[in-house]
């Protein structure tokens, strides 16, 4: 009998924004214990859109947004199901 791996995903992201009077600043974020790759992609898009909206409301613009979904097995090891996400939400 073949046992399927029980994978979880960790979302690692970085966001850079620019305000005319401040310049460019960046931050990183992590969301862990995501149930599957689809949920990780959805969360990455939700975070990107939400942050872009907040930045624009304050008069700035998003310079860069990157996200990476890292698959981990039950022991916490990275496995070959990880992927980078690119969105054109800028």
Locations of the language-model features?
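A short, exposed loop/beta-hairpin motif centered on an aromatic-Gly-Thr core
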Residues: 23-39
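Short, mixed-charge low-complexity intrinsically disordered segments
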Residues: 49-90
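Short N-terminal "domain-start" leader segments
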Residues: 1-6, 88-89
């Amino acid at each position: 009998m073949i046992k399927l791996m029980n994978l979880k995903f960790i979302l690692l992201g970085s966001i850079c924004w620019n305000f005319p009077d401040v310049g460019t600043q960046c931050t990183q974020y992590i969301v862990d214990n995501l149930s599957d790759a689809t949920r990780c992609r959805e969360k990455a898009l939700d975070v990107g859109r939400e942050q872009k909206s907040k930045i624009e409301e304050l008069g700035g613009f998003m310079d860069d947004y990157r996200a990476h979904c890292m698959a981990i097995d039950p022991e916490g090891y990275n496995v070959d199901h990880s992927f980078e996400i690119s969105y054109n939400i800028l």
